[in-house]
Amino acid sequence: MRAPGARILGLIAAALVAGAAAAPAADAAKNLEIGIADDAAVLENPDPARAARTVADWRALGVDDVRLFALWGRISPRPRDERAPAGFDAADPDAPGYDWSALDRAVALVRGAGMAVTLSVTGPGPVWATASPSTRNARLDPVPGEFGRFARAVATRYGARVDRYILWNEPNLPLWLQPQFTCRGGTCTPASPHLYRRLVRAAQPAIRAADPGARVLIGALAPSGQNPRSRNATMRPLTFLRGLGCVDRRARRDRRGPCAGFRPAAADGIAYHPHGVRRAPDARAPQADDAGLADLGRLEALLDAVQRAGGLRNTLGRTRRFDLYLTEYGYQTDPPDRFAGVRPQQQARWLQQGAYMAWRDPRVRNMTQYVWRDERTGPNGAGWQSGLRFVDDRPKPALRSFPQPFWADRTVARRAARLWGQVRPGGSHAVSVQRRTPGSARWTTIRRLRTDGRGVFTLRVAVTRPVDYRFTWRETPGAAVRASDPRRVAPVRGR
């Protein structure tokens, strides 16, 4: 998910910097939330004291929002049975058999620390809530009405403490929803988008009825997929969205087959997981129907086209474009993951670049770090190792930079760069922007300024030779000076 060197440059360059703009870009996301998601650290943590320390650490690092799973099959009674318990009322959160204890503790911890909670209401559910319970496959064909009743129970129980819900997690992956495709004679056509649309249409009004002021997000799609050769291949996210909205590749309405009698899914926003794996944040996905962070423009264009075609309905306004919530984003590291990881220093660098890119997009409202602490590494790199800490709790370089991301954008002009930084938690802070000549140990302050209400500042600087930049700040007056990672800015060849 650096560089060395520094003396003051010449008077001319200094004058150019002194006259540079320091205000955030007009088209940037002014209210970008910082989130984190790691159920193992809080929701599933058997040590209450450790979970409390973790939540306190998150708050101190500037986290605004914590995503937690309301996992249907874990909360519901007798999830492996083919029949629901006799007399069980799934819409009633007080129905005997529901076990809310772990989620209750996690929500209370997060809210008590002053952070918001986003609940991902998701399967797999109980076997008895599927269309074919005899298969004992909890991921296969969940019954929309049953999911709607569970969603209502969740919103009834947590509505006073939760303002945002996500409907299902990564429905384009067979790990979460099946079948992904219907395959006949070697041809596979999307199935999961149509099942997901029915799940959303059942759960969204159920949540609204129990928690009228809530925001309900849909999507939460994984960023890449496969060319399908079986019914449970992973589906590419843009393929999924076209199926969800019943449009063809040119975003024209399609009302054939599973789209007959089409009625659109409705939502307040779109959740998305633009993990880059080993690809830099600004590197585009090689497949046109996949979308990483660099491809959000393509994703947004498709969402707009589907919405115009009547395939999705924004409940915040008929013509209002959907906001994006990046509810998972991370880079796995090597060590320990030698299959999909990058070096820990590269993780720190790319997470900061990703934070800048998310801020730069005015439609992005949330960026959530996934995860806090590495999972244990299984065969072939199984598990997630994108934490800010290793599994043994040792910090990675990204933990140091997380509360003070800093990036230098060389794409803004031929002989200029935009410096971007953020102090987390947000609020107005005094920062000092410094520079040094590569090879020098001396940093010189070139500008003192205040951040905006989200802790963000930008500064345009002239680029005439290689220079290192950083910013410094104090958490409180008299506290120790904290410094961002340095960024080297150099002229671009050919410009």
Regions found by a protein language model. Name each.
Residues 32-38, 64-68, 117-121, 165-167, ...:
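Hydrophobic faces of well-ordered beta-strands that scaffold small-molecule active sites
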Residues 27-65, 69-71:
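Boundary/entry segment of secreted carbohydrate-active catalytic domains
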Residues 45, 51-52, 144-148, 190-344:
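Noncatalytic carbohydrate-binding groove/subsite architecture in carbohydrate-active enzymes
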Residues 455-459:
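Short strand-edge motifs at loop-to-beta-strand transitions and within beta-strands
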Residues 61-233, 275-277:
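Substrate-binding cleft and catalytic face of glycoside hydrolase catalytic domains
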Residues 46, 82-86, 91, 157, ...:
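Aromatic-rich peripheral "rim/lid" segments of glycoside hydrolase catalytic domains that contact
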Residues 9-20:
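Bacterial N-terminal signal peptides
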Residues 444-454:
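Solvent-exposed serine/threonine-rich low-complexity stretches and specific carbohydrate-binding patches
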